[in-house]
């Protein structure tokens, strides 16, 4: 208990609260786009009555969804029979098989025209998980304050001292990941509802949102949001353990911080400077930011080949 109180000091708690509030402010600012709240509300009321373009676009999407699914399946069947893709040991053939199998699950699902603005806005905003990850790195940095004095020698040299400390800290990281993700996500979700109004039926298919046209799991919006939250916890916790291991391995916190900064810089360079068609460019789909945010990877269909076995990535 003392270790938890030491790690989650008043300063850390205040920092987390401030970061979450700033995240809400940034999200709200992005939605308002320079307008006042009154102007934004007026625009939303008018758009509900006059936005024929968006209504027509959504109607066309809903009417054409099952045809789109059927076309993907038919195209996969046609490509499978072509000589160029006939080798059953190659990635291209197995990719076609997996794609056909995944889209087959979506045949015949019924979509409905709904107001999903708040949910769509919430899912498109991907900074929340990044803020949570940065806070977790700061918390881990704070964990190793004993490196600045000789206390760590006494703890590490005592019987089972290092093991107990490690287990307590891993537990603390998990609890922190769970709470921070929940508070940060629920705050943005509530803000989206305040701005755009209540969501339509959360039990209808997530494919009602156009961004999920290629999402091949027939689940509800509520189930998807729950799945997204679980994935965010898993990803943030896993990355936090890697950061924790790096801090534990290096003697100085500054060294670990510099290594993390270097990795993030290389990732940024790869993401922004790699040319299309290159092998490195393929890493864009699985860069750190996309992995942390999860939604950009979850909401699309893509396959991976691991030891010759082709499967859907998630």
For the regions a protein language model found, what residue spans apply to each?
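Alpha-helical transmembrane segments and their immediate interhelical loop/hinge regions
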Residues: 151, 162, 166-167
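Short helix-to-coil transition segments within interhelical loops
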Residues: 156-162
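Extracellular/periplasmic helix-loop-helix junctions in multi-pass membrane proteins
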Residues: 273-287, 303-313
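Aromatic- and glycine-rich beta-strand/loop motifs that create alpha-glucan
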Residues: 1-16, 20, 167-169
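Central hydrophobic cores of alpha-helical transmembrane segments
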Residues: 17-19, 254-267, 285-286
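Membrane topogenic helices and adjacent juxtamembrane segments
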Residues: 62, 68-106
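Secretory targeting signals
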Residues: 23-53, 57, 72, 95-146, ...
């Amino acid at each position: 208990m003392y270790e938890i109180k030491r790690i989650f000091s008043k300063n850390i708690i205040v920092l987390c609260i401030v970061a979450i509030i700033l995240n809400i402010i940034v999200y709200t600012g992005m939605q308002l786009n320079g307008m006042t709240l009154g102007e934004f509300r007026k625009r939303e009321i008018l758009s509900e009555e006059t936005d024929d373009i968006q209504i027509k676009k959504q109607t066309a999407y809903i009417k054409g969804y099952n045809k789109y699914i059927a076309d993907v399946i038919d195209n996969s069947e046609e490509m499978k029979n072509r000589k160029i893709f006939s080798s059953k040991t190659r990635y291209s053939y197995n990719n076609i098989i997996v794609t056909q199998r995944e889209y087959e699950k979506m045949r015949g699902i019924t979509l409905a025209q709904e107001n999903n603005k708040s949910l769509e806005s919430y899912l498109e905003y991907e900074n929340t998980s990044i803020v949570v990850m940065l806070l977790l790195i700061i918390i881990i940095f704070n964990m190793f304050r004993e490196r600045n004095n000789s206390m760590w020698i006494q703890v590490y040299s005592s019987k089972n001292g290092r093991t107990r400390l490690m287990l307590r800290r891993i537990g603390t990281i998990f609890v922190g990941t769970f709470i921070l993700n929940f508070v940060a996500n629920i705050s943005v979700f509530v803000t989206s509802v305040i701005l755009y109004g209540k969501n339509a039926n959360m039990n209808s298919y997530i494919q009602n949102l156009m961004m999920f046209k290629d999402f091949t799991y027939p689940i509800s919006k509520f189930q998807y949001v729950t799945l997204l939250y679980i994935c965010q916890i898993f990803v943030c916790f896993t990355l936090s353990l890697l950061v924790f291991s790096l801090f534990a391995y290096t003697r100085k916190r500054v060294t670990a911080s510099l290594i993390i900064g270097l990795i993030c810089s290389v990732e940024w360079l790869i993401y922004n400077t790699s040319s299309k068609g290159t092998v490195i460019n393929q890493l864009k789909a699985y860069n750190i930011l996309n992995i942390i945010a999860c939604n950009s990877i979850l909401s699309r269909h893509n396959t991976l080949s691991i030891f010759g076995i082709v499967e859907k990535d998630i």
